[in-house]
């Protein structure tokens, strides 16, 4: 056993030797199976080798290539007239040898139009003289096997047959009982062609072993379809005894048609001798002229070039033409690659059916170093695919949950009106939460750290109307720039957006962003101009600024409702609610089916110390009950309890009701869909599948983040090891975790790289302390607490735990910490300058008599001597004297003598620059 076998690998030529096959046979099967290889010396895995062995056991005869070749040459004359249809070869499949004839396994087809079969007499032809070579082959035992009967199973054809084809099929119905002589020659009878655009052929099924009692299938001697059918059919002349035909050259192998890879069936058809049962295909008659090779009829489905010969001429002609036809077929079908995200180099190579070395080489030429197991992001994978001639298309991603997608076809008959979902959006500190508090008569804003909202709150209120109380659902989103994802999530599930703009501040960046989110979600916008009670309020200026973003007030001829309000004074709140109900009634059609299993979206999620994972869910269709089996993204759970926005326990949540859900096995991601299932086993299976896919995507992203370009690698090698700051993030809710990670990724990381080891909702535990101690990481605790014993463990292990309540303070500290990891840089600090007025010889050297023009000169400081534009010396001030006395420094406006041990070529007019090198703290910018 070779070393490759011992390592779980085997070379192709070793496998071919074990199977008794030619290397080209095995390579052809490798290509058919999609196994990457280059030569017969390439190695494949043991699993791939088993697939090849299984294919050969189902396919090629055990005698190898030589025996198959003798059988095919001997049976060529008997099988010539039976090839009524030649199928196209599959894309990428290369036949092993020109003279091998792949046998087609098809079954007879019952015509779609039943007609009364009329038996036709078979013409009796005289015996032809057989050449010696053919006679020897006919005497071989393999030829005797070729004439044994084969059972044929009829299959109903899905192809429609028009009236013109029925006449051609009549003579083929009842001729299976007619005998055929082995010496019978090809009868080139006229036939009608089938439709060019035929649907895919049915899968071939292996034929049973020949039985002595099985009836002998007989086919009429019909030729293949002509290359150029003509409207005037004429029977082709047959060879006679006086004009013996020359021995025919074996025909090129007829390959099975290309099929999708997922379809079953044998990869290699068994190479049986004898007559092959074929499906009768009507062909259009055309005049044929017998040639020396007798292959003047173009194959059905083949693509021929203008002026191509009929098969005669130098050897290799049919092989060459077949290769041209296969190349033409390949060119016809564009190579399309579907990508849905990050992908490893090995998976990309398997999808494109190219060696992995080709992808590695392509990226190397673009200064990107990767290995076979490395993950490429989607942009890089698309670049490689286009370089290799593939057209990249994005796989249809599963759409995220929206209010319209929650409705199914079966809900139409049971739809009822549901309350509208209103999202409060706007710039930070413009009074969004205060306005909602005034509507709810609550004080949520007082509990927010720093006075800014840092997570989504969902609330339900009742509005008294003349027809009775009506419900409104409010979502309060953060206005800080770090919480972009939360605002986008709020706009995604909302029906109406209330844009809060401060009358004394006007339109700000987060106001513009909120407008963009609302327009992208396609929801109507209602503007609440807040703080109109302040002295410097200017509502008209706010309206003017909003017109720049296509929000024109109704009183100016537009369609946007703008209501001046005051959250503190509770001014015009009833008018705001009234307009919300008007927009919901006249512009929207809000319906849901409460009599079905619930579906919806997770608005927020957190880990509670006493209650476990808690998710704030918005039911968008159906009714959520206690005890329901629920799947949230990749998390399975059973609803243990439901709480409304005021903390009251409820048994069910109808559509558009926000509730807190208890009973999940883990903290879900904010924005995930949830759905209730009746079968617990099915729910667990779906959750497990999503978990596996999420884990794979997470690993791919981690691998993609470690990819290093050649330029960056060289720079890091010159400057030393790249600095890295490891972090562990813990926050109160999942949305805050997302916001922190997104904000950290925006920090410059060219000099110091951030590596987030863990990021999740929940308190800081002792496990986090152990991980931080082992990896020298810093723990960031955002609006959460430390578990019992965690603080003491952190002090003992020396782990830095930073606690924050406001996100921008966290970002400032992290940036300072990243800058602290940078080595200080040396910068030049200018001290002064002097001009050489006169040169004095002193001993063996010279001293420059100077006049200090600016700053001061210091002894032992560094100096630079300039003569014109050229620097003639750079060194230290070794001696500094004033009136023959040593001086430590000489200030501006005084004369002095300057000397250096390493420079004596002073000249009047030289300029002296005195400076020193100092260290300076580096910044990320």
Curated annotation (Swiss-Prot):
Q: Which residues bind GTP?
A: 426-433, 476-480, 530-533
Region of interest: G2: 451-455
Composition-biased stretches, type Low complexity, lie in 289-307
Predominant location category: cytoplasm
What's this protein's function?
One of the essential components for the initiation of protein synthesis. Protects formylmethionyl-tRNA from spontaneous hydrolysis and promotes its binding to the 30S ribosomal subunits. Also involved in the hydrolysis of GTP during the formation of the 70S ribosomal complex.
Report the family membership: Belongs to the TRAFAC class translation factor GTPase superfamily. Classic translation factor GTPase family. IF-2 subfamily.
Protein's UniProt name: Translation initiation factor IF-2
Name the encoding gene, please.
Answer: infB
């Amino acid at each position: 056993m070779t070393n490759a076998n011992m390592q779980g690998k085997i070379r192709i030529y070793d496998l071919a030797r074990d199977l008794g096959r030619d290397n080209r046979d095995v390579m052809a099967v490798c290509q058919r199976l999609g196994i990457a290889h280059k030569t017969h010396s390439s190695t494949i895995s043991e699993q791939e080798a088993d697939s090849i062995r299984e294919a050969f056991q189902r396919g090629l005869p055990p005698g190898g290539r030589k025996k198959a070749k003798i059988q095919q040459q001997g049976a060529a004359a008997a099988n010539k007239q039976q090839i009524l249809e030649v199928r196209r070869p599959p894309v990428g499949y290369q036949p092993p040898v020109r003279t091998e004839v792949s046998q087609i396994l098809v079954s007879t087809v019952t015509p779609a139009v039943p007609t009364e079969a009329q038996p036709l007499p078979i013409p009796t032809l005289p015996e032809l003289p057989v050449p010696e070579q053919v006679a020897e082959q006919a005497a071989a035992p393999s030829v005797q096997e070729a004439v044994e009967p084969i059972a044929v199973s009829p299959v109903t054809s899905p192809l429609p047959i028009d009236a013109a084809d029925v006449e051609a099929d009549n003579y083929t119905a009842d001729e299976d009982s007619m005998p055929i002589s082995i010496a019978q020659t090809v009868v080139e009878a006229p036939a009608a062609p089938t439709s060019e655009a035929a649907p895919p052929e049915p899968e071939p099924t292996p034929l049973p072993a020949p039985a002595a009692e099985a009836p002998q299938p007989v086919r009429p001697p019909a030729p293949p379809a002509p290359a150029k059918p003509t409207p005037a059919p004429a029977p082709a002349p047959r060879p006679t005894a006086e004009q013996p035909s020359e021995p025919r050259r074996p025909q090129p192998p007829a390959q099975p048609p290309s099929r999708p890879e997922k379809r079953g069936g044998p990869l290699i058809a068994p190479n049986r001798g004898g007559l092959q049962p074929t499906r009768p295909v009507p062909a259009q008659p055309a005049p044929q002229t017998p040639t020396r090779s007798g292959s003047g009829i173009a194959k059905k489905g083949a693509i021929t070039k203008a002026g191509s010969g009929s098969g005669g001429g130098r050897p290799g002609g049919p092989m060459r033409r077949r290769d041209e036809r296969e190349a033409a077929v390949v060119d016809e079908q564009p190579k399309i690659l579907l990508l849905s995200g990050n992908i490893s180099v090995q998976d990309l190579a398997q999808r494109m059916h190219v060696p992995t070395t080709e992808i590695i080489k392509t990226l190397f030429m673009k200064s990107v170093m990767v290995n076979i197991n490395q993950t490429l992001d989607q942009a890089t994978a698309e670049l490689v695919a286009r370089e290799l001639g593939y057209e990249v298309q994005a796989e249809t991603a599963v759409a995220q949950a929206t209010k319209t997608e929650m409705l199914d076809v079966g809900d139409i008959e049971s739809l009822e009106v549901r309350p509208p979902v209103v999202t409060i959006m706007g710039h930070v500190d413009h009074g969004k939460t205060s306005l909602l508090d005034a509507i709810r008569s609550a004080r949520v804003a007082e509990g927010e750290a720093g006075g800014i909202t840092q997570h989504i709150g969902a609330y339900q209120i009742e509005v008294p109307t003349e027809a009775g109380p009506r419900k409104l659902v409010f979502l309060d989103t953060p206005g800080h720039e770090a919480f972009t994802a939360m605002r986008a999530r709020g706009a995604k599930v909302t029906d109406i957006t209330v844009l809060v703009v401060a009358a004394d501040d006007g339109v700000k960046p987060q106001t513009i962003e909120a407008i963009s989110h609302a327009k992208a979600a396609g929801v109507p916008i209602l503007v609440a101009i807040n703080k109109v009670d302040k002295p410097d309020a200017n509502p008209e200026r706010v309206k003017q600024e909003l017109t720049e973003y296509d929000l024109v007030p109704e009183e100016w001829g537009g369609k946007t409702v703008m209501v001046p309000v005051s959250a503190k004074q509770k001014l015009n709140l009833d008018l705001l609610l009234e307009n919300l109900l008007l927009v919901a009634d006249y512009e929207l059609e809000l319906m849901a089916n409460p009599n079905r299993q619930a579906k919806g979206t997770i608005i927020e999620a957190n880990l509670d110390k006493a209650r476990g994972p808690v998710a704030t869910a918005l039911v968008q269709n159906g009714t959520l009950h206690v005890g329901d089996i629920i799947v949230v993204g990749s998390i399975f759970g059973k609803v243990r309890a439901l709480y409304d926005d005021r903390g009251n326990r409820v048994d069910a949540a109808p559509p558009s009701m926000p509730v807190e859900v208890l009973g999940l096995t883990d903290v879900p991601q904010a924005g995930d869909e949830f759905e209730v299932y009746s079968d617990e086993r099915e729910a667990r299976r779906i959750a497990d599948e999503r978990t596996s896919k999420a884990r794979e995507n997470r690993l791919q992203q981690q691998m993609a983040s470690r990819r290093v370009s050649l330029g960056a690698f060289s720079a890091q090698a010159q400057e030393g090891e790249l600095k890295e700051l490891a972090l562990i993030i813990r926050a109160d809710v999942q949305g805050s975790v997302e916001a922190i990670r997104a904000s950290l990724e925006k920090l410059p990381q060219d000099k110091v790289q951030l590596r987030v080891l863990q990021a999740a909702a929940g308190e800081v535990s002792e496990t986090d302390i152990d991980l931080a101690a082992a990896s020298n990481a810093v723990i960031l605790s955002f609006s959460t607490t430390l578990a019992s014993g965690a603080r003491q463990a952190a002090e003992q292990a020396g782990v830095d735990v930073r606690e924050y309540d406001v996100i921008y303070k966290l970002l400032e500290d992290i940036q300072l910490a990243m800058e602290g990891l940078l080595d200080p840089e040396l910068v030049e600090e200018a001290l002064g300058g002097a001009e050489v007025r006169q040169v004095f010889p002193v001993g063996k050297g010279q001293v420059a008599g100077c006049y200090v023009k600016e700053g001061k000169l210091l002894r032992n400081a560094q100096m630079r001597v300039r003569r014109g534009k050229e620097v003639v010396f750079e060194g230290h001030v070794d001696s500094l004297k004033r009136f023959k006395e040593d001086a430590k420094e000489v200030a501006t406006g005084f004369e002095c003598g300057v000397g250096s041990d390493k420079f004596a070529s002073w000249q009047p007019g030289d300029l002296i620059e005195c400076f020193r090198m100092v260290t300076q703290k580096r910044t990320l910018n």
